[in-house]
Amino acid sequence: MQESASRLLVIGGSPPGSGCVAEIILRDICLIYPLSRIFCFATVDPSYKFEPVQELSSVQVCIQRTKHEHGYRAVGCPIGSLTAFAASSFSFRWHVKKLVKEAVLFGRKHHIDKVWMILDTTTTIAMGMDVALELGVPLLSNVWDPPESFLQQRRIDRFSRSRLIKRFGETLRLSEKVAVVSESMQQDYEQNYGANTIIMRHGILPVQQSEKTKLSCIDKNIVIGFAGGLYAYSAWSCLMEALTLNDWKLNGRNVIVRVMGAGFYFQSKEKANIEYLGWRSMSEAVKLLADCDVNYLPYPFESSSYYMVKYAFPTKLSTYAATGRPVFVHAPEYSSLHRFYKKHPVGIYCSSLEPSEVITGLEKLVSNKEFYAEMSNKMVEMANGELSLENFHKQFAEFVGIKRNTLLTK
């Protein structure tokens, strides 16, 4: 079995772990791949603390600290941009070349067959195709978020951004296969870069719950669930305003918003019913969300998040799918979610920041038992289909060019 699996060198901004989403996805992939044939080269922030996963103790992991991953300006004016560009051109490029050499040595040591570049940081984009070219092996590229989004978030100056995005395109063109997360990303990367793409989205096992398609008892509160990082501030503020204006009631029943995540900041001078449960493991989060009536999936309406909203795909939808509960999607019409939702309607889609429209959508979902059951059933179908663990495994096998039965799954 192991002989048919390529010896993979994975280069990305995180090692496999149980912390952030990137760590979890890589961990789940390592757990199904022959452990003696996957090798991880992680370029992490200087303050990052590596916590190995016990089940993956035999996986060879090389941790390298990044420099100049985030931009800076010496002066807040055009001269400042030029100064930052000069610093990047010398210090950053020198450091990237050093990392490429280290990755090549690591790859040669382990007789690598293919390089899998996860283009999720400034550093990995700058490394691009160089490691694969030096090793003389095929290149696989993986894009979770569009570079236009996270390079701007990292305050990379416009000159370096332009150079890095050009580098990104060159890497995709030279890749044997490119894994993307959304239909919008797939369409544009094929058109703009001639990339050979495949959609690859994380999947998890659904919870076993016999009452998924039913609302909670009529004499109980309506619980709206939310898990993960909160960065869709305008959408969240709109939800809070809508519930406040409606006295935190839907269809005459009290509403509780259940929140899970490592950090959560909220303040209100009005009545609010928020249950903050802190950070929970994936399995805990799924069970707690499955006990909610509907789960909330917001995406930013802010123009500064345009690229992320259009091209990225929220991994929390895979988590929500595993619960079997319908979702209230709150996102602009140009988002990747809108295109996905038209094909997979699993609740209510609201593209407005008008509080009245939020209430109308939520009440439609929780007041119509037949509609609620239909949406719940569609969510169960999606959890066992498009966003299933099995489909994730199939997509990954196709991405790396191996047979599905090569993966170590039951």
Predicted region positions:
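Membrane-proximal helix-turn-helix segments that form the acceptor-binding/catalytic region
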Residues: D28, W94-K97, K101-V104, A126, ...
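Conserved catalytic-core segment of nucleotide-activated headgroup transferases in glycan assembly
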Residues: L205-Q209, S216-K269, E275-S283
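A charged, aromatic-enriched C-terminal amphipathic alpha-helix characteristic of glycosyltransferases
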Residues: L353-E357, K369-V400
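Carbohydrate-associated surface elements
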Residues: S184, H202-G203
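Short N-terminal targeting/anchoring amphipathic segment
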Residues: A103-T124, E134-L140
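A short, active-site helix/loop in glycosyltransferases that binds the activated sugar's phosphate group
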Residues: V44, E170-T197
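N-terminal subdomain of nucleotide-sugar transferases
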Residues: M1-R65, T197, L243-K249
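Nucleotide-sugar-dependent
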Residues: S234, S283-A290, N295-S318, V327-R339
